[in-house]
Regions:
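Glycosyltransferase-associated regions of secretory-pathway enzymes
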Residues: 1-65, 81-260
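Small-residue hinge/turn detector
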Residues: 66-78
C-alpha cells in the first residue's frame, strides 16, 4: 500500500500556536492543494490511543507528540511533519509510490521531524509495541525520549527494513543556498515545545540539582571549618607545651654531634 496523500501535524499543550508556525503550516497547504490536511489538537486526538497508559503518564507535549505521530500514521497513514518545517515544494516526487519514507538530518541519522508511511506499516507497529512509559531509565531526559519513542527508536528499527526509502539530509535539512533550491522543506528548529511544559520541568530539575549542590558545598564548608579549627587548636596546644631549658637543649645537640 502506498503512502496516502494526507499531511498530519500536531499541536498540543496549553499555549496557542505561535504566528510563525501558522505560516509554515500554510506552506504545506499551498504546495499540496489536492491533499488532505490534519492539524491534530487536544480536542481531536484519538479517543482510544493504543498507548493510552504511556500517554497518561507523560506531561510534556513533546513527549506525547513523539508517541502520537507514530500512532496517527499507523492508523491513518500519510506524512507527518513538525509545525516548524516550512514546505518549499511538493512531496509527490520523493514519495513516488513508497510505503515508508524516512528523513535523515545527518548521513545515516534518522529524525522523526518528518515521516511518511502507509497505514498499518509493520515498522510503525513494532515501534508502538516497543513504546514504554517514561520511567527513569536514563539520567538525561532528552536521550530517554529519543530512545523510547523518538529518532533512536526509528533508527534502530529501520535496520530490519532495508527496503524503506531514506531521504538524504539536503532534502529536508539544506545547509547551503544551492541545496535549498532542490530541498522539499527547511527545518526552522523552533523547539517551541521546550518553551512551555518541558521548560518548566527542566527548570524544576535544575533547581533541585542546584539545591543539592548548595547542600554539598555547605557540608564541605563546615567540614573545612571544623578541620581548620581543630588544626588551630592543636597548634595552640603545641605552643603551650613547656620547652626544655637552654642548657638541656645545648647538651642534646652536643650529644647528637658526638653520635654522628
Amino acid at each position: 500500500m502506498r503512502v496516502p496523500r494526507i499531511i498530519h501535524q500536531i499541536w498540543i499543550g496549553p499555549d496557542p500556536l505561535p504566528e510563525p508556525h501558522r505560516g509554515w503550516i500554510e506552506s504545506w497547504r499551498r504546495h499540496h492543494p489536492a491533499w488532505e490536511h490534519r492539524l491534530w489538537t487536544e480536542d481531536d486526538l484519538p479517543a482510544d490511543p493504543i498507548r493510552a497508559e504511556a500517554l497518561n503518564r507523560l506531561r510534556a507535549p513533546v513527549e506525547r507528540a513523539d508517541i502520537l505521530r507514530l500512532e496517527i500514521l499507523f492508523r491513518h497513514g500519510g506524512v507527518y511533519v513538525d509545525t516548524d518545517l516550512e514546505c518549499l515544494r511538493s512531496l509527490d516526487d520523493v514519495l513516488d509510490g513508497e510505503d515508508f519514507v524516512g528523513v535523515c538530518h545527518k548521513p545515516g541519522r534518522i529524525t522523526n521531524t518528518a515521516i511518511a508511511a502507509a497505514p498499518g506499516h509493520p515498522l510503525l507497529e513494532r515501534a508502538l509495541a516497543e513504546v514504554r512509559p517514561m520511567e527513569m531509565y536514563w539520567t538525561n531526559a532528552s536521550e530517554r525520549l529519543k530512545e523510547v519513542a523518538g529518532p533512536l527508536l526509528l533508527e534502530r528499527l529501520v535496520q530490519d527494513y532495508p527496503d524503506v526509502k531514506l531521504l538524504e539530509p539536503p532534502v529536508f535539512f539544506p545547509s547551503t543556498p544551492e541545496e535549498r533550491e532542490h530541498a522539499v522543506a527547511v527545518h526552522h528548529m523552533a523547539r517551541v515545545w521546550h518553551n512551555t511544559t518541558t521548560l518548566r520541568a527542566a527548570m524544576l530539575r535544575a533547581e533541585k540539582r542546584l539545591e543539592k549542590t548548595r547542600s554539598r558545598l555547605e557540608e564541605e564548608r563546615r567540614a573545612h571549618a571544623e578541620t581548620k579549627e581543630r588544626l588551630a587548636q592543636l597548634e595552640k596546644e603545641r605552643r603551650k607545651e613547656p620547652r626544655p631549658p637552654k642548657r638541656e637543649r645545648r647538651d642534646k645537640r652536643a650529644w647528637l654531634r658526638r653520635s654522628d
